[in-house]
Every structure is written in C-alpha cells, then in structure tokens.
Amino acid sequence: MNKEKNSYRDAIKDVELTMMAIDSHFRTHKGFTDSYLLVMILENEVGETRLEVSEGLTFDEVGYIVGSVSDNILHMHTYNYCEKNREDIYKWLKASRIEKFKSDYAKMLMNMHFGKENNVGSNINLKEEF
C-alpha cells in the first residue's frame, strides 16, 4: 500500500513539474499556440479501456496519432496550450499519470464522466485519493 501511495505521489509531483513548464509556456505565448494535448479513451477488442494522453503535439502529429489508432476511440479531445485550457490540461495530465498505477482508472473515468447519462466533454473533478 505504501508503495502505491509513493507511486501516486511521484505521479502528482511529475504533473506539477510539467505544469510549471506549461505555465512558463503560457507566460510566453498569451494566446493560442501551435501545441496541443491529445486525450483519448480507447477500448480494445476484448472491451478493456485505457486512457492515453499525448503532450506537446503539433496539429499534424495529432492527426497522425488519431489516424493510426487501431482500438475503438470512445472519447477524444484536443486541447490547445493556452491559459483558458489550463485546468483541463492539468486534470488530464493528472489522470494520465495516475492511470499508470491504477489499472482501472480509465474505465472509472469513462463510466463516471462519459456515460450515456452525461455529456461527452463534461468537466472532471479529480480529487486526492489518500
């Protein structure tokens, strides 16, 4: 249990460091930039779901990744690196880092926030779990 908590804390520290770099990017580029965060919730042929978050992509790279995915895309969103998207970027980075240590995290996210009763793209409120 302690090992899992330490891994979780390390993941959060990694996100905080990444967000510091992104904040610097926001200060330099006040408006929209040519850099994107790609969020996908994927389902393989046996029904297992996973969350994939790719950082710092150009628009062409986003198109290439989406076009080369062989799994079923249950949810996909692209966030431009700009100040107004800061909170969404932070939440998805956090979710992607935590998912490495919690194997059912993508499925839980999908069920809670992207189910039939909810609108796709609703805001996600990730909370500390320890």
Curated annotation (Swiss-Prot):
UniProt keyword rRNA-binding present: no
Pfam families attached to this UniProt entry: UDG-inhib_P56
Function: Inhibits the host uracil-DNA glycosylase (UDG), an enzyme which removes uracil residues from DNA by the base excision repair. Interacts with host uracil-DNA glycosylase and prevents the latter from binding to DNA. Since the viral DNA polymerase efficiently incorporates dUMP into DNA, the virus needs to prevent the deleterious effect caused by host UDG when it eliminates uracil residues present in the viral genome.
Keyword field: Early protein, Host-virus interaction
Keyword Cytoplasm belongs to the record: no
Family as reported in the entry's similarity comment: Belongs to the phi29likevirus protein p56 family.
Highest taxon of the lineage: Viruses
Subunit structure: Homodimer. Interacts with host UDG; this interaction inhibits the uracil-DNA glycosylase.
Record-given protein name: Protein p56
